[in-house]
Each structure stands twice: as C-alpha cells, then as structure tokens.
A protein has these predicted regions:
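An amphipathic, aromatic/His-enriched active-site/gating alpha helix that lines ligand/cofactor pockets
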Residues: 6, 36-45, 64-101
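Short, well-ordered beta-strand segments in beta-rich or mixed alpha/beta enzyme
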Residues: 11-18, 48-77
Length: 117
C-alpha cells in the first residue's frame, strides 16, 4: 500500500552507473551532452549528478519527473538521443546499469536551501 505522503503524480529516478575510474573524464564528456538534453525536457523537474566518495567510479543520477513510471519507460527512455550516449558509455561500464524508481513525498517533505546550489 502506498504511503499517504507519496504524491499521486511524479517520480524520482535513481540511475547508478559504475565505470573504471580511469575513464571518468571520457565518461563525463560523453554524459554532458545527454545531461543537457534531458534536463531541458519539460517533464524533467530536477536533475543532479553525484559521484561516490568511497568508489570514484560509481555515479548516481537523480532525476525527478512530472510523469509516472509507465510514461518514463514508454516515452522518455525510448527517445533516440539516448542511443549515441549509450553507445559511447556502455563499453566503460564495469557493472550493469541500475535504474530505481521512487514515489516522491508531498511538499512537506521537501527542503532545498540556497546553499545547496
């Protein structure tokens, strides 16, 4: 049963990609273009990139979308602009990519301070 605090629309997508840390510069160069394109999508309300402090080759992308998981899988993930990014970066992956979907809690559970930027 869903929590009463989870919003009825919108999701948070957490993508984890693991590469050899020696490929970090090449990976980020290939990722930059797709990051800009995805972040510009009107349904993408938030996009932040993280790198593990314990494992430098582990990257986490957190994307918030105004749509649901079905839309994300059927519409967003099928866009042609992902193909060059996958072709360029997948050979760098040393583990399979992980994609996890989360329901977003209502606004009472959201805080973003100016210092976060």
């Amino acid at each position: 049963m869903a929590s009463p605090h989870v919003r009825s629309s919108g999701i948070s997508v957490h993508v984890t990609i693991t590469i050899d840390p020696a490929n970090t510069s090449a990976f980020l160069a290939a990722f930059r273009r797709i990051y800009d394109i995805v972040a510009a999508e009107p349904e993408c309300t938030y996009f932040e990139v993280f790198q593990s402090l314990e494992e430098p080759g582990v990257f986490r992308f957190v994307e918030n979308w105004s749509k649901d998981v079905q839309w994300f899988k059927e519409v967003q993930l099928t866009k042609a602009y992902y193909t060059p990014y996958i072709e360029a970066t997948e050979p760098m992956w040393i583990k399979p990519r992980s994609i996890k979907y989360f329901g977003r809690f209502s606004g009472e559970w959201l805080t973003v301070k100016p210092e976060n930027n």
